[in-house]
Every structure is written in C-alpha cells, then in structure tokens.
Amino acid sequence: MRLTALVSGTVQGVGYRRYVQRHARDLGLSGSAENLPDGRVEVVAEGPPEHLERLLHWLRRGPPHARVADVQTQYSEATGLRDFHVY
C-alpha cells in the first residue's frame, strides 16, 4: 500500500524530513519526504498498512521543534519504491 501525506504547520527547517526518514526506515518503509514551496512537507511511503499507520502517528507528532497543524492523507496501490529518500 502507498500513503501520500501533506503535512502543514511549522515543518520546514526543524529536522522534520530526517525525522520522517528515520521512522520510515525503522518501520521498513520506502518512499520520500520533500519540502514543498508552500511550506508543507510531502511524504510518500510504501509498505504494509499497519506500518503506514504507525508512520502516520509519527507524522502527526513531529520532532521537538516542529508544530504539525494538519496531515492530509491519501492511500493508493504501491508502485515498488526502494529505500527512503529526503529531497
């Protein structure tokens, strides 16, 4: 399964993408985290549904200096991504 999440709030410049990468890799997920020009972070992750739900918990929490205001999610079929990258 594939999760696409758009995370808004204070999520750029606070280590959010590396935080997501660490938790995604710990869960065995593949995908990416990328800063968007509008201040949000887009997270794409693929793996078992129960692992995606655990990642979603971490997305909503964020690292200490982040302030997550909203997480919009969409689920779709996995496309076979490998590893987890930060852009």
From Swiss-Prot:
Pfam families registered for this protein in UniProt? Acylphosphatase
Recite the UniProt keywords alphabetically.
Answer: Hydrolase
Q: Where is the Acylphosphatase-like domain?
A: 2-87
EC number of the protein = 3.6.1.7
Catalytic residues, per the record, are R17, N35
Task: Write one Gene Ontology MF term.
Answer: acylphosphatase activity
Name of the protein in question:
Acylphosphatase
Organism of origin = Deinococcus geothermalis (strain DSM 11300 / CIP 105573 / AG-3a)
Identify the gene encoding this protein.
acyP
